[in-house]
Structures are given as structure tokens and as C-alpha cells.
């Protein structure tokens, strides 16, 4: 883990450094995995869902920015829970839920990696066992990588952020020249169920903005820089997502979208950039998903280390097993693999979206409770809280009306986090 005291004598981070962290965290594997899923629900109106998702992220980013500016640390959301909600059962349950949310996100991204790998290496095939094989394989490889080295994660991400952005910008520029307005005109508004389902999924593509808060302790003037960084990073990402959605719906037919929803970005590249462009985008997607799994595993392991040092996990979880890995790391990885095998990409996206929304709603509660200390605007926080509540209720209702089994996993995640927290407190584990 990084030592944050005195910033290790390194030059403090400026505005564009923090913005780069935010864009890199948001514009990652999520867009490769989620764009097709969102387009299946909203079709020509997909860009509207990404725009609304960006607005929700802006409100949430405001709460995050004020907390990060006032309480700079590398603990991020876990530290916010402790400060605003104390060290009781509720705070611990939210920390466990956030940890579980990251685990579900890894499973989702692994599924996307498997889909792109099969599309690239077994053209025309959509065999489930092949997708699962590649998905489980990349989780195992990245777990091993994290067990051997901590230092390579950051450097790898910097390189891959540049590659991802260049590939996506190339796709957008090519798409603008061949944009077909008739394909992206909204003839009828989507149903409320489709709208809220899509908002929940698109918000997941923005969820990485929280990573900027983890860098607050390395910023020269966090009170000034953090709010600006959140605004710029989320704004740029929103424009990028809207552009990608317009390009996708303009050049990929509904039939292709239904068949290749998990690899929609690559399908959009084929008519725009030819076979070479298609190969470049697929390789970019594989690199993006692999690096996202790597970075998220790194985050999960560090959060577990942080929670262990605060005595918020059983001692066994932090007991060393091999190199830098612990028993807790292995238990979480096994859980991730089980979820990868049990749920498809769409269901995993729904579970991760719902639990992310709930965790970020809790950040609003923390910000409201600490509003005087963090110099936050109460009206903005209240509006943001109400918007987040509306999205959560609408998203859950849409899943219920569809009879989605993801709802069972969402409820199970909430109950599991709460029960484990209660048991740990009762047994004085923490």
C-alpha cells in the first residue's frame, strides 16, 4: 500500500493529474461491457440514459469531492463511512457491501473479457463454456499477478488509459463522418421500466469517479482542486459516453446488437474501421478488461488490508498464505469465480449497479451529517439524495417487474453484509 505521509516527498498532484485518475477509472472496462447492455434497453435513446447517468454522477461527485477535500486520505469511501456513521454495525455493513460490490464488478468485467476473447479467438462462436473458461482464467492470472507485485499495477494503468482513450476517440471520429441521423432519432419515449433499468446500468459506467477521492491526500490544495477535478472528469466522461452511444446506434443494427450485446463496441468498429480497426478495438477491450480486473483486485485486497488493520475483519482473513496473498484474498477470489459462473453479464451489471447506488446513497447521508465540517451546500446534497433515491427505487422496481433473478442477488448481498456485520460485532471480532 502507498505511504501517504508527506506524500513521500513527491510533487503534489495538480488538477489535471486528478482528472486523469478519474477519467482513467471511469473510462475503463465498464464502457466495453455496458454500452451494448444499455443499448438493448433504450435503443435510440441510449445517449439520453448516459446523459442522465452523468447528471446523477455529478451530484454524487459533489458529495465525494467535499468529503475528499475535507478528509484527505487513501481510505476513500470506507473512511467516509467511519467518519460519518461511526464504527457500528451499519458502517461495517456498508463497508462489506462496498467490498462485495467491487467483487461483483470484477465478475462482470471478467465476463466481458471472456466474451471479447471468444469473439476474437473463436470468431462466430458464443459458446458459454468458452466464455466462462476465459473469464475464470483471467481472474486466476490477475490474482497471481497481484500476489507477486504491487508496483506494476499503477504503471500498467497509466499506459492502458492512453491506449483506451486513443481507441475510443478513433472510433468516435470515424463514426461522426458516417453518422446516420435516421438510426438515432427517438420516435417514441422509452418505457419507465426500460429507462430506470438503463439508468442503473449506465451509472455503473461512471462509478469509478470515487477513485479520485483516494488521491485527495496527495493533492496540493484539495479544497480547490478536488471539486474542480470531479466536475471536469465527470463532464468529459459524460460527453465521451454520449458520443459512443450515438456512434453505436448509428452503425450497429438492432439484430446485431441483440446477438452481440456483450461486445457491442467491437461490432460498431467493424463497419467504421474495417477488419483491422475491429481487431484493434477488440485488443483494446481485452487490455482494458484485463487491467480493470487487475486494478479492482488490487483495490479489493488493499481495502481488506485496511479493514483488517482497523480490526473490521476476522484475523483469519488477514493471515498470510503465500507471498502477498492472504486467506481473505483467496476466499474473495473464490466468491468472485462463483458469481462469474452463476450469473450472466447483464445480471452481474444489475447487481453491481444496485449495490453501487446504495453505497453512494450512503455517501450522501454522510455528507449531509458532516455538511458543516466539509462546507457543503445542503440544497445540492438534498437534491442529489432525492435523485439517487429515485434512481434506486425505479431501478429496483424495474428489476422486480421484469422478474429478474438479479433482484434476489441484490437482496442477498444486502442481507449477507448486514448479518456478517452483526455477527462480527456480537462476537467482538471488530
Curated annotation (Swiss-Prot):
InterPro entries per the UniProt record, alphabetical: AA/rel_permease1 (IPR002293), APC_superfamily (IPR050367)
Cytoplasmic side: 1-14, 60-88, 150-157, 214-228, 294-325, 369-379, 425-430
Protein name as it appears in the record: Inner membrane transport protein YbaT
Upper classification of the organism: Bacteria, Pseudomonadati, Pseudomonadota, Gammaproteobacteria, Enterobacterales
UniProtKB keywords: Amino-acid transport, Cell inner membrane, Cell membrane, Membrane, Transmembrane, Transmembrane helix, Transport
Subcellular localization, as worded in the UniProt entry: Cell inner membrane
Membrane topology: Multi-pass membrane protein
GO molecular function, one term: transmembrane transporter activity
Transmembrane annotation, as ranges: 15-35, 39-59, 89-109, 129-149, 158-178, 193-213, 229-249, 273-293, 326-346, 348-368, 380-400, 404-424
Gene Ontology annotations for the cellular component aspect, listed alphabetically: plasma membrane
Function, as annotated: Probable amino-acid or metabolite transport protein.
Sequence similarity: Belongs to the amino acid-polyamine-organocation (APC) superfamily.
Main location: membrane
Keyword Membrane in record: yes
GO process annotations (BP): amino acid transport; response to pH; stress response to copper ion
Periplasmic topological domain: 36-38, 110-128, 179-192, 250-272, 347, 401-403
Database matches in Pfam families: AA_permease_2
Superkingdom, natural source: Bacteria
Gene name per UniProt: ybaT
Amino acid at each position: 500500500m502507498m505511504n501517504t505521509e508527506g506524500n513521500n516527498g513527491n510533487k503534489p498532484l495538480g488538477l489535471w493529474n486528478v482528472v486523469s485518475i478519474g477519467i482513467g477509472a471511469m473510462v475503463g472496462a465498464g464502457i466495453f461491457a455496458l454500452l451494448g447492455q444499455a443499448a438493448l434497453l433504450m435503443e435510440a435513446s441510449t445517449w439520453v440514459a448516459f446523459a442522465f447517468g452523468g447528471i446523477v454522477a455529478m451530484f454524487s461527485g459533489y458529495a465525494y469531492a467535499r468529503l475528499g477535500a475535507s478528509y484527505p486520505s487513501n481510505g476513500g469511501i470506507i473512511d467516509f463511512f467511519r467518519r460519518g456513521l461511526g464504527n457500528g454495525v451499519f458502517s461495517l455493513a456498508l463497508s462489506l457491501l462496498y467490498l462485495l460490490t467491487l467483487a461483483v464488478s470484477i465478475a462482470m468485467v471478467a465476463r466481458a473479457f471472456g466474451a471479447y476473447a471468444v469473439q476474437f479467438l473463436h470468431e462466430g462462436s458464443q459458446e458459454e463454456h468458452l466464455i466462462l473458461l476465459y473469464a475464470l482464467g483471467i481472474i486466476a492470472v490477475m490474482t497471481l499477478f497481484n500476489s507477486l507485485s504491487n508496483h506494476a499495477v499503477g504503471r500498467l494503468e497509466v499506459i492502458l488509459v492512453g491506449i483506451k482513450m486513443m481507441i475510443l476517440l478513433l472510433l468516435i471520429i470515424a463514426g461522426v463522418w458516417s453518422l446516420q441521423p435516421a438510426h438515432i432519432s427517438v420516435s417514441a419515449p422509452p418505457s419507465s421500466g426500460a429507462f430506470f433499468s438503463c439508468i442503473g446500468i449506465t451509472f455503473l459506467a461512471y462509478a469509478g469517479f470515487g477513485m479520485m477521492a483516494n488521491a485527495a491526500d496527495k493533492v496540493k490544495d484539495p479544497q480547490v482542486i478536488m471539486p474542480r477535478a470531479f466536475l471536469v472528469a465527470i463532464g468529459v466522461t459524460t460527453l465521451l459516453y454520449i458520443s459512443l452511444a450515438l456512434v453505436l446506434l448509428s452503425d450497429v443494427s438492432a439484430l446485431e446488437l441483440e446477438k452481440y450485446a456483450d461486445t457491442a463496441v467491437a461490432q460498431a468498429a467493424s463497419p467504421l474501421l474495417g477488419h483491422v480497426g475491429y481487431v484493434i478495438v477488440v485488443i483494446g477491450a481485452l487490455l482494458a478488461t484485463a487491467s480493470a480486473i487487475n486494478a479492482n483486485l488490487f483495490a479489493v485486497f488493499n481495502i481488506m488490508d485496511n479493514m483488517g488493520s482497523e480490526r473490521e475483519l476476522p484475523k483469519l482473513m488477514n493471515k498470510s498464505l503465500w507471498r502477498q496473498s492472504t486467506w481473505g484474498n483467496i476466499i474473495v477470489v473464490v466468491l468472485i469465480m462463483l458469481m462469474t459462473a452463476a450469473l450472466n453479464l447483464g445480471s452481474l451489471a444489475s447487481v453491481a449497479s444496485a449495490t453501487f447506488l446504495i453505497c453512494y446513497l450512503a455517501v450522501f447521508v454522510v455528507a449531509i451529517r458532516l455538511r458543516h465540517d466539509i462546507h457543503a451546500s445542503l440544497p445540492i446534497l438534498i437534491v442529489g439524495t432525492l435523485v439517487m433515491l429515485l434512481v434506486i427505487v425505479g431501478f429496483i422496481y424495474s428489476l422486480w417487474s421484469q422478474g429478474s433473478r438479479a433482484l434476489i442477488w441484490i437482496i442477498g448481498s444486502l442481507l449477507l453484509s448486514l448479518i456478517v456485520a452483526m455477527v462480527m460485532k456480537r462476537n467482538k471480532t471488530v
